């Protein structure tokens, strides 16, 4: 329910995107950075339904988009990436983590994460799709996290994992880092 209450609440199910503060925030960000600022953005979510709801908000702004998810045949994925890269009218690339590997999306300047993966490497991989060799723009990576939520707890766990990993592989790390693990 951190993403959109209508995804699980039967009362709100007919219009799940209407009860979604995250989508409201996404719409505000895309309006400012893409519609008014002319930038291209990549929006990641772990959930296909969430990318569908986000796509509705993108259309409402009058922005062009493409959407990649696990159900898109491999033969069509290159076409979607080409449209995003080459068509100035396509400003938003929506993707599940099915699009996390092998995507080269450095023509975007904005990366928006609608949810936080448990594995910090997945988050890094999402960012690497945009911030990579050939990138000529400053990249803005945005995490949309519901405050005081389970999701915020997951973010804290992910940050703890990252801290632990960084200190385990750092030759200068101290032994007290072991205490981070619970």
Where does each model-flagged region fall?
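SF2 helicase/translocase ATPase core recognition
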Residues: 64, 76, 80, 91-179
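Conserved Helicase C-terminal RecA-like lobe
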Residues: 1-93, 97-101, 172-182
């Amino acid at each position: 329910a951190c993403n959109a209450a209508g995804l699980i609440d039967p009362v709100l199910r007919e219009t799940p995107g209407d009860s979604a503060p995250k989508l409201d925030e996404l719409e505000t960000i895309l309006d400012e950075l893409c519609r008014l600022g002319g930038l291209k953005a990549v929006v990641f979510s772990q959930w296909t339904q969430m990318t569908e709801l986000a796509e509705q908000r993108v259309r409402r702004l009058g922005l062009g988009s493409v959407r990649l998810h696990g159900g898109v045949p491999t033969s069509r994925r290159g076409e979607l990436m080409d449209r995003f890269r080459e068509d100035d009218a396509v400003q938003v690339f929506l993707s599940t983590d099915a699009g996390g590997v092998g995507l080269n999306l450095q023509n975007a300047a904005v990366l928006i994460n609608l949810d936080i993966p448990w594995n910090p490497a997945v988050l890094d991989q999402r960012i690497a799709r945009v911030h990579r060799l050939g990138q000529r723009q400053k990249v803005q990576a945005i995490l949309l996290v519901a405050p005081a939520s389970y999701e915020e707890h997951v973010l804290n766990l992910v940050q703890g994992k990252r801290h632990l990993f960084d200190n385990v592989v750092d030759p200068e790390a101290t032994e007290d880092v072991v205490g981070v693990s619970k």
